[in-house]
Amino acid sequence: MGKGVGRDKYEPAAVSEHGDKKGKKAKKERDMDELKKEVSMDDHKLSLDELHRKYGTDLSRGLTTARAAEILARDGPNALTPPPTTPEWVKFCRQLFGGFSMLLWIGAILCFLAYGILAATEEDFDNDNLYLGVVLAAVVIITGCFSYYQEAKSSKIMESFKNMVPQQALVIRNGEKMSINAEDVVVGDLVEVKGGDRIPADLRIISANGCKVDNSSLTGESEPQTRSPDFTNENPLETRNIAFFSTNCVEGTARGIVIYTGDRTVMGRIATLASGLEGGQTPIAAEIEHFIHIITGVAVFLGVSFFILSLILEYTWLEAVIFLIGIIVANVPEGLLATVTVCLTLTAKRMARKNCLVKNLEAVETLGSTSTICSDKTGTLTQNRMTVAHMWFDNQIHEADTTENQSGVSFDKTSATWLALSRIAGLCNRAVFQANQENLPILKRAVAGDASESALLKCIELCCGSVKEMRERYTKIVEIPFNSTNKYQLSIHKNLNANEPRHLLVMKGAPERILDRCSSILLHGKEQPLDEELKDAFQNAYLELGGLGERVLGFCHLLLPDEQFPEGFQFDTDEVNFPVDNLCFIGLISMIDPPRAAVPDAVGKCRSAGIKVIMVTGDHPITAKAIAKGVGIISEGNETVEDIAARLNIPVSQVNPRDAKACVVHGSDLKDMTSEQLDDILKYHTEIVFARTSPQQKLIIVEGCQRQGAIVAVTGDGVNDSPALKKADIGVAMGIAGSDVSKQAADMILLDDNFASIVTGVEEGRLIFDNLKKSIAYTLTSNIPEITPFLIFIIANIPLPLGTVTILCIDLGTDMVPAISLAYEQAESDIMKRQPRNPKTDKLVNERLISMAYGQIGMIQALGGFFTYFVILAENGFLPFHLLGIRVDWDDRWINDVEDSYGQQWTYEQRKIVEFTCHTAFFVSIVVVQWADLVICKTRRNSVFQQGMKNKILIFGLFEETALAAFLSYCPGMGVALRMYPLKPTWWFCAFPYSLLIFVYDEIRKLIIRRRPGGWVEKETYY
């Protein structure tokens, strides 16, 4: 392989200047597919000579400075390209002109148009349309600013990719060590790293000394991984001789040659993949779009029909255009945009109190319609701390307490064997508590040391008191640290116990290796020879604990005889001058990262809510399956193919996969699957665990679920999860353990890292969907009594019953608080017991909702308004039949002798005062019938009497709208400002019977729905 090969396939192909858009798009898709493939490299297989040939690097002196400068010029700096961010002004414009706002803008423009037409054609005209246009524009701008502020506040996007690049790196060039900027590291550089450093680029290790790296941000595995020059695995992500860019070196030192830099590193590929993925449209955005189509359709249909009708009725063109505009504007629910924004914001605030931080307001609802959750294991389902789970000593398994608050079972701590075991676990252990934590509970203390050793340290500290004092009593003389060839750790301590020899040798390590070094075993404090029977007992215990997905360690000791090893003996760990065989076996201790306490309950809730929970983890299949069973992702009694094969004692290949409800898929099998095979697994198995998966596979799993039509939520904390988080319908990152990159890709952040918070989120999301429906039903209903006066005015030629300004007073005044108050309504029934909604069929606004709001309740409201209108005119001398066809004379300011039914003559001024009084009364009637509408909108199925009136905001809303209506009617000066006049108290009561009718009508309808579920009434009217 020549230099530079293997790099070329990531270089962007040259696109000709006039290369069309399609070419670019296809290329982008090709690049994305390339990134989704597994990491392929062969540097880990090359010998040192081949490496030297491939990169032209002297393995002791490094590159020359000149050569390094050439490569830097060719490849560019070793940095990740930051993801493309949307400029703030674009985000702001989206809020101002997106979706619903567009409808209001069109309304405002039409108003200005109508005002312009009137101003040009008549000397004397009113300014209603001008006011209306200004108010509409103001509504859009104010709600736009509000949504923008809300989103900007919750998504202060972290500059996370910048923080990931280590600032300095130690390279060897021209045979000299020099510290340079990490951005200047080039392919072929010889780099040195030590404990505490971040790895500056992808390295092929050529020499190492006790080096361990923490790959958790990349693979999700919490255990530090050993790094050495040995080629140990075909898979570059698993082999020991490659260290990855931006992972941390925890201990030891290593030297390596840089094989990839910047965007070409494994981490860089993941980052590019995440920033290149398109997140789709959120379900609620799609719903609102669908709703706008409906409303616009209705408005335009009515407008055009009446435009044609008014021409047939011999109105002039100009009048007809004014009518058209009037009808379209009356149809637009001006207050709805604000209502939806406020409802989503309230829910986002409520979720923040429950530890869910929502970055994108629309994501609030998406979580409610989720049908599949792909959850990471470590830290989300589990506590993300290794904990001692079981011990095996005195030939039986003892259970330790793994609960977060130590409320579980404990075991017999009096046995002499346990004392010996705890002594080894405390002494043969390099973990220490960090300083100044004496006041913290033991489990909460920070530990310096690897995960398994800290688990042992905390366990012994809890059971046996201070480990520090134990270590002071038994001073350490020498130790052999754990290494991958012997697989044990050993130390020798001074022993001050009078009845024991002066030196104590303790050892721990891989159980089978430890057992091989033992010839006796301690049972109930007495040493016995290790026979076959006891070896079998050990083997069974080891298999049982391993089968629980636990990490098992074996412990043994030896009391060194004083005659051979007197006081002051010089122990030598290089030329070993003390026994490491024929030791005495004490017992096993097994550890696991235990499930969080609230998770099994949360998984159960998901199941009853019809949500499928899939575990996707980088961990071992056995551990993954054990945790899945522990939290209920694989429920009791459900078997995998392997379980069935074991039970029937037949080979796995003979089991029909469809007989197994549960399924554990290994990453290496997933690699060779076609998308059809993956679809089959997702379709036919209800309980699925994917283990040993790579970041790219997470993404493939998410896409597979989406092909099934599922709305997918993904949880994750590592950088490795960011592509899947971005692709999912809703990405959920972890607030505590999460890397910045994953937080940036996500839509929502769990502040307490707890899976149970997701379930709370689902509940809130479902509730907001229900409540938005109610809010919209309430808001839309008053559209009918707002439009019909205009239509009757055109058809029957009567004085206008309701003016434009009064319509605005309803939409932006009296209806606002009640509509928002419905967002505080509690759930009617257990919303977590029903299936997730199907986004294709179960819409936010459907035909049934429109038919209820417009066709039924709205019509009753309109009747109430007209009744009041006719009563007032009749009291003033104009009987209903006398009004037909009177409009032309009525609106003519030069006619001052219009006669009423009793022959009285009315001047223009007097007529207009009566007309505006009618407007005010019609407005008040709408408020009165909206009382009933608000109360019936509280529930969709239950009776209002079942639901109760616990919603204080709603009760306030009722009083607020009434007070506002009274204020507008009786406040002095309103006659000039809004042309609203005081009403006789009796006129308030005209609409009461209609209000009562609405309430009774709807209660009967809901009663029928409850009595006959699935019947005709439910099919036609349940929205």
UniProtKB/Swiss-Prot annotation:
Q: Which SMART domains match?
A: Cation_ATPase_N
Sorted alphabetically, which keywords does the UniProt record give?
Acetylation, ATP-binding, Cell membrane, Cell projection, Ion transport, Magnesium, Membrane, Metal-binding, Nucleotide-binding, Phosphoprotein, Potassium, Potassium transport, Sodium, Sodium transport, Sodium/potassium transport, Translocase, Transmembrane, Transmembrane helix, Transport
The residue ranges for the Extracellular side of the membrane come to 109-131, 309-320, 793-802, 867-918, 971-985
Question: Membrane topology for this entry?
Answer: Multi-pass membrane protein
Q: What is its EC number?
A: 7.2.2.13
Q: Which residue stretches does the UniProt record annotate as biased composition, category Basic and acidic residues?
A: 1-11, 28-38
Bilayer-crossing residues are 88-108, 132-152, 289-308, 321-338, 773-792, 803-823, 844-866, 919-938, 952-970, 986-1006
> One GO CC annotation, please?
basolateral plasma membrane
| Processing and modification events after translation | Phosphorylation on Tyr-10 modulates pumping activity. Phosphorylation of Ser-943 by PKA modulates the response of ATP1A1 to PKC. Dephosphorylation by protein phosphatase 2A (PP2A) following increases in intracellular sodium, leading to increase catalytic activity.
Subunit organization: The sodium/potassium-transporting ATPase is composed of a catalytic alpha subunit, an auxiliary non-catalytic beta subunit and an additional regulatory subunit. Interacts with regulatory subunit FXYD1. Interacts with regulatory subunit FXYD3. Interacts with SIK1. Interacts with SLC35G1 and STIM1. Interacts with CLN3; this interaction regulates the sodium/potassium-transporting ATPase complex localization at the plasma membrane.
What protein is this chain from? Sodium/potassium-transporting ATPase subunit alpha-1
Say which species the protein is native to. Oryctolagus cuniculus (Rabbit)
Q: Which gene encodes it?
A: ATP1A1
